[in-house]
UniProtKB/Swiss-Prot annotation:
Belongs to the insect chemoreceptor superfamily. Heteromeric odorant receptor channel (TC 1.A.69) family. Or67d subfamily. The gene is Or83c. This is Putative odorant receptor 83c. Residues 1-39, 91-136, 208-282, 327-365 are cytoplasmic. Signal peptide: none annotated.
Length: 397
């Protein structure tokens, strides 16, 4: 994606790219009306297939609870993927509306000067960097989980599967059955990987616009401060009590800052409402997967679960890290408003500014179940809880 293109064109291309990935799974979130096609039903079949085989393996554990625990290892990933798929199906119109709204902001503001143009472009660059990190992480995890069974088979003949479920009628001791099981699990992992990646992208496409709007608020505050400083300079050159030109422009800039902060607040509220369940499912399901992986490896080392522990921790941490970055953006918004040269405002303008200042003290943070903020601090609390619960389970085992 060339940086010589306009920000709106880059954003439009990025939206289409993410939509092309979700379209592989049968969900076209840019379409005015969601239609089920063969890809949609294939995705539904893959989810049902994985769920059925996992339940079968858990119930047919041969009396060994560890086998059932290993089979349930990737239920966290199941909830994770199911949450994203259902969000696309049930909230398709809201997702589309939010993307088109962001597109309209890019179309409007890219022509308002170099400051806005640079701010919009920097957001696209930031999102592309996040996409690269997510993509590399998932590709590495997929390749590792795919190559591990082959490596162990070639090393000492041990037959393990990337995913811990068994298929009825296909014993792993039989060469043909092992190959069929391996291929079916590979297809399932491909669907899962594309779903995880595309799901993360459309969530991050929405979340990163909070950073963009925060940066644009800084630009607007700078424009207001420049006008107020110019007023102070003019006042030093004229006699006491004389009127100073530019009052209408200063009023317009102040109202522009107030309106933009209201837009910023409304957008944060809309994002929270749209992805409230999805973000909670993402973080908590990955926490569940980490706990199961940790418990399995406490009894004896199990390579697939150890790898999935790293994948789950990675998947949870990218959301929590972005949540912390968003918290810094809220602080940035409040600091920008506090830095307004308020003493150059008129009496009526100060009243308006007072309302703005009070509103900025209560940002709409991204929440997990309305209890915990999405942040690295919450991730550390979850990790401590996982360790405590795992120790308790092992002591009772």
């Amino acid at each position: 994606m060339s940086t010589s293109e306009s920000p709106s064109s880059r954003f439009r291309e990025l939206s289409k790219y993410i939509n092309s990935l979700t379209n592989l799974l049968g969900v076209d979130f840019l379409s005015p009306k969601l239609k089920f096609n063969y890809r949609t039903w294939t995705t539904i079949f893959a989810i049902a297939n994985y769920t059925g085989f996992t339940v079968f393996t858990i119930l047919n554990n041969g009396g060994d609870w560890r086998v059932g625990l290993k089979a349930s290892l990737m239920t966290g990933g199941l909830f994770h993927g199911l949450g994203k798929f259902l969000t696309c199906l049930l909230k398709h119109q809201d997702m589309r509306r939010l993307v088109l709204y962001s597109q309209s902001i890019y179309d409007e503001y890219e022509t308002r000067g170099d400051s806005y143009h640079r701010t919009l472009n920097s957001n696209i660059d930031r999102l592309l960097g996040i996409m690269k990190i997510i993509r590399n992480g998932y590709v590495f995890a997929f390749c590792l989980m795919e190559l591990l069974p082959l490596a162990m088979l070639m090393y000492d003949g041990t037959r393990v599967t990337a995913m811990q479920y068994l298929i009825p009628g296909l014993p792993l001791e039989n060469n043909y059955c092992y190959v069929v099981t391996y291929m079916i699990q590979t297809v399932t992992m491909l669907v899962q990987g594309v779903g995880f990646y595309s799901g993360d992208l459309f969530v991050f496409l929405g979340l990163t616009q909070i950073l963009t709007f925060a940066d644009m608020l800084q630009v607007k505050v700078k424009e207001l401060n420049d006008a107020l400083e110019q007023k102070a300079e003019y006042r030093a050159l004229v006699r006491v009590g004389a009127s100073i030109d530019g009052a209408e422009n200063r009023q317009r800039l102040l109202l522009d800052v107030i309106r933009w902060h209201q837009l910023f607040t409304d957008y944060c509220r809309a994002i929270n409402a749209l992805y409230y369940e999805l973000i909670a499912t993402q973080v908590l399901s990955m926490a569940l997967a980490m706990m199961l992986s940790f418990c399995i490896n406490l009894s004896s080392f199990h390579m697939p679960s150890a790898i999935f522990f790293v994948v789950s921790a990675y998947s949870m941490s990218i959301y929590c890290i972005l949540g912390t970055i968003l918290e810094f953006a809220y602080d940035q918004v409040y600091e920008s408003i506090c830095n307004v040269t308020w003493y150059e405002l008129s009496g009526e303008q100060r009243k308006l500014f007072g309302f703005l200042l009070r509103e900025s003290q209560y940002p709409h943070n991204i929440q997990i179940l309305g209890v915990m903020s999405l942040s690295v601090r919450t991730a550390l609390q979850i990790v401590k809880l996982i360790y405590s619960v795992s120790m308790m389970m092992m002591n009772r085992a």
